[in-house]
Amino acid sequence: MKAVDDHTLEVTLSEPVPYFYKLLVHPSTSPVPKAAIEKFGEKWTQPGNIVTNGAYTLKDWVVNERIVLERSPTYWNNAKTVINQVTYLPIASEVTDVNRYRSGEIDMTYNNMPIELFQKLKKEIPNEVHVDPYLCTYYYEINNQKPPFNDVRVRTALKLGMDRDIIVNKVKAQGDMPAYGYTPPYTDGAKLTQPEWFGWSQEKRNEEAKKLLAEAGYTADKPLTINLLYNTSDLHKKLAIAASSLWKKNIGVNVKLVNQEWKTFLDTRHQGTFDVARAGWCADYNEPTSFLNTMLSNSSMNTAHYKSPAFDSIMAETLKATDEAQRTALYTKAEQQLDKDSAIVPVYYYVNARLVKPWVGGYTGKDPLDNTYTRNMYIVKH
């Protein structure tokens, strides 16, 4: 990597990466101020020390309370920025998020909207409820290396026994799409085909799942028992309760719910000391590899501990593809391999549901990556 001149950066890749240009908008490729880091060391991110190149700069930061940004007069397009200051509040509870919104304390929510409040809010303030496609998949992650989950029959039974329609339409009821794979079908560069089982009725899926469990040695007299891990969240708890009930009702699997705080939850998944875990992945960039690369055998994000030479080989071929049609076909093949191996239990493709005050102008919600920039917004007189 080298700077050719003040406005040109040249990057030489070790191998062809057709989607490289999409990676450049990811925060990990943002430039950092060398002089500020050398001067302030670990305190270079503090207000007064940090140097930014965006429309806003850091004014105040109180850990676990708020982050305040103010308009940057040195931003190249500062003349087009309207909002002078924006405050971000770290709110962990979905219900608290809505309550603070309704009290007038905040102008826009960020968390998942509470299941029990969504329909009520749609009736009471329909113009303030925004629901848009989001490049994320909610799924249950199976520990592919731990017996008995290293048996594809057991993994497939869990996949088939999950009633996505009930989860999406009855439990969550916010417009999410039932998922049949890992990569959302509306991802740029994806032309995915639905697997055969997705066209079956839930009754047929349950029958096939029971057959597979019986082949693996599990019956009504000797049922499969699993621990379902989820991180602390109102939503994840409700979905975990529903999932455990569905697996019990549909295919006779006994489920014990295990709750952990976020950091412990991540450690448990990385260490592989779990059976099945709540999981979700949101794209870092709008291209299938943002999902598929996380399932490579050597990926640090592969907490399903899925190891497939066949899948790895397909993904290696995508880098050698000479045109978009070839890559698209290989992405489809890779998804089919994940489905054949039942590496995960896909549940639904997200929508982004949030509350936005009517006086917030410029918010569209149309970016599937949810890149929402305050510099594009304004406040209408009210």
Regions found by a protein language model. Give the residues of each.
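Bilobed periplasmic-binding protein-like "clamshell/Venus-flytrap" ligand-binding domains
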Residues: 18-24, 52, 215-235, 277-280, ...
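Ligand-site clamp/hinge motif
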Residues: 65, 72-120
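Long beta-strand-rich cores associated with HINT superfamily self-processing modules
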Residues: 354-382
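Ligand/substrate-recognition segments at binding pockets and active sites
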Residues: 63, 206, 210-283, 324, ...
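Structural transition elements
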Residues: 177-215, 233-238
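Extracytoplasmic/peripheral linker and loop segments enriched in polar/acidic and small residues
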Residues: 1-4, 202-203, 254-265, 270, ...
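Alpha-helical secondary-structure segments
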Residues: 6-12, 54-55, 83-85, 135-180, ...
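Gly/Pro-rich hinge or "lid" segments in bacterial periplasmic/extracellular proteins
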Residues: 2-7, 13-85, 211
